[in-house]
Amino acid sequence: MFEQQSPLGSDQDFSAIMNAARHTMPRLLVIDDDNLHRMIICRVAAKAGFLPAGAASYDEAAKLAQETAFDCITLDLSLGNHAGSEMLHHLSMLGSTAPIIVVTGADYATCKETVKVAERLNLDIWECIPKPVDLVMLRHFLERLKASWNTVAVAA
């Protein structure tokens, strides 16, 4: 009998493609405990040329951030039993230099305080985007980040 060939090729071929993509596309960590928001942000990011990885909890995000040097991060400030500020402290302990886009339902004062905390931790918050997410605005910020990443990647 004939084996049907997957249109993606073998699992080994697919892994090779994904490994190559990891070196040519910026990696984005999407931290949001809301499944729908996380999925939407991942899709917008993929369309903007990122390789997104979603984390539904503080623990999952902390593990991913420790295992992978992400080029960019989106962070919800409310992560169930943890605050986004706890994630900022964790990212700082890891020495993360990834630009951060805060995506939150919190008010302006909370966003402003988050930026101050991030600055004290030597983290780089690019923007605070309110929920519900304006997809055009999100894509605009991601495209700016990708252009910045491309400039750095070409210079390296």
Task: Name the predicted role of every residue range.
Residues M1-L29, C42, V136-A156:
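Non-catalytic signal-transmission and effector/linker regions of two-component phosphorelay proteins
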Residues A20, N35-A53:
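Two-component/phosphorelay signaling modules centered on CheY-like receiver
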Residues D32:
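Conserved acidic carboxylate
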Residues G49-S57, L64, I129:
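Short hydrophobic/Thr-rich beta-strand motif most characteristic of the beta2 strand and flanking loop
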Residues S57, A83-E86:
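Acidic catalytic/metal-coordinating carboxylates
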Residues D76:
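Active-site residues of response regulator receiver
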Residues G80:
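The feature encodes the CheY-like receiver
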Residues E86, A106-C128:
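Alpha4 helix (beta4-alpha4-beta5 surface) of REC/receiver domains from two-component response regulators
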